[in-house]
Amino acid sequence: MKVLLDTCAVIWATLSPNSLSPQARETIADEANTILVSAASAWEIATKVRLGKLPGAEKLEQDYLAVMEEAGYELLAIDTASALRAGRLTAEHKDPFDRMIAAQALALDVAILSSDPQLDQFGVRRIW
């Protein structure tokens, strides 16, 4: 199964695995699953580190590509079709990072691994 991590799941999986739900940890650990991470998560982490809103994640931001590679995650680029889809989503949720991750999940027909129920308004499948 392919699963797209939201940004909080990326952070918790790499910095604080016990913050993940048992199901989330099992999903990530299952080698039969392909774990996807959007470029939107890199953008969000870098932005929040720069603004001082993500204390303790500076090393993750600096070593992001190496950390993702070591974890075995597949990185998703942001393409024009996903950007258009994110902008066209009618849900009221305004977070641009969440909108992009939801658009990518919908385009790929994959579930999002996230604790955030706000993502449900996009009509995505969510695992937690």
Provide a role label for each language-model segment.
Residues T7-C8, I45, A86, A105:
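Generic structural signal for small/hydrophobic residues in well-ordered secondary structure
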Residues P55-L65, E69-S115:
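Active-site neighborhoods of divalent-metal-dependent phosphate/nucleic-acid chemistry enzymes
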Residues S16-P17, K48, L89, R125:
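Residue-level signal for well-ordered alpha-helical positions
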Residues A9, S41-A42, S82, I101, ...:
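Alpha-helix capping/helix-boundary segments
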Residues M1-S38, L51-A66, E70, L108, ...:
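Short, well-structured N-terminal submotif of metal-dependent ribonuclease cores
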Residues A39-T47:
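Short, conserved active-site loops that position catalytic residues or coordinate cofactors/metal ions
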